[in-house]
C-alpha cells in the first residue's frame, strides 16, 4: 500500500487538497513504476521553518519552495525483496508561503501549485535532479508529462 504521511505546520492546507496530492503522487508512482508498498511524508511549513531547514541541512540560508530528502540517495543498492517492509522514499517539505506567491505569479490556484511542488519533490526522491541542463530537461519534461497526463495544468 502506498502511504503518505501529511503534516501541516501552517494550518493553511485544506483536507481536500491532501486527497488531490495523494491521488497525484499515486498516479506519478504508477507512471514511474514504483512498487505499491512504498511510503513518504509531505510536510507543509512557513518561510521561517523552510529557511531554517535549508540552512541546517543544505547550508543555504534562504527561503525556497520545496526541499526533498531522499532516504535512498546515498545508500548502496540493497535488495529488500525478501523482506515484508515498505520502501521508504523520503520526505518532501513544501513552503506554503512561497507556494501562494508562485501561484499568484503564475496565475493559477494555490491548490495547483501545491500539487506541482509535491510532484517536483517526489521526482527528487526518485533521483531526478536539475543540476545540469540535461538533467533539468529530463526532470522538467517528466514533470510536465505526468502533470498533463494527470490533468493538473496551469489553466
Curated annotation (Swiss-Prot):
It is found in: Cytoplasm. Keywords: Cytoplasm, Endonuclease, Hydrolase, Metal-binding, Nuclease, Ribosome biogenesis, rRNA processing, Zinc. One of its GO terms (molecular function) is zinc ion binding. SUPFAM superfamilies: Metalloproteases ('zincins'), catalytic domain. Coiled coil: none annotated. Zn(2+) binds at residues 120, 124, 130. Its EC number is 3.1.-.-. One of its GO terms (biological process) is rRNA processing. It is an enzyme of class 3 (hydrolase). GO terms for cellular component: cytoplasm. Its cofactor is Zn(2+). Signal peptide: none annotated. Pfam families: YbeY. Binds 1 zinc ion. Single strand-specific metallo-endoribonuclease involved in late-stage 70S ribosome quality control and in maturation of the 3' terminus of the 16S rRNA. Belongs to the endoribonuclease YbeY family. This is Endoribonuclease YbeY.
Amino acid at each position: 500500500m502506498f502511504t503518505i504521511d501529511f503534516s501541516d505546520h501552517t494550518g493553511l492546507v485544506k483536507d481536500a487538497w491532501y486527497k488531490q496530492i495523494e491521488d497525484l503522487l499515486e498516479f506519478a508512482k504508477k507512471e514511474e513504476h514504483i512498487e505499491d508498498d512504498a511510503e513518504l511524508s509531505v510536510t507543509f511549513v512557513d518561510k521561517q521553518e523552510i529557511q531554517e531547514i535549508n540552512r541546517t541541512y543544505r547550508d543555504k540560508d534562504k527561503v525556497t519552495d520545496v526541499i526533498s530528502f531522499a532516504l535512498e540517495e546515498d545508500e548502496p543498492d540493497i535488495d529488500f525483496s525478501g523482506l515484508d517492509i515498505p520502501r521508504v522514499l523520503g520526505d518532501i517539505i513544501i513552503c506554503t508561503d512561497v507556494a501562494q506567491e508562485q501561484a499568484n505569479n503564475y496565475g493559477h490556484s494555490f491548490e495547483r501549485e501545491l500539487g506541482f511542488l509535491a510532484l517536483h519533490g517526489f521526482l527528487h526522491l526518485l533521483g531526478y535532479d536539475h543540476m545540469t541542463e540535461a538533467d533539468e530537461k529530463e526532470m522538467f519534461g517528466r514533470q510536465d508529462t505526468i502533470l498533463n497526463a494527470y490533468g493538473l495544468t496551469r489553466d
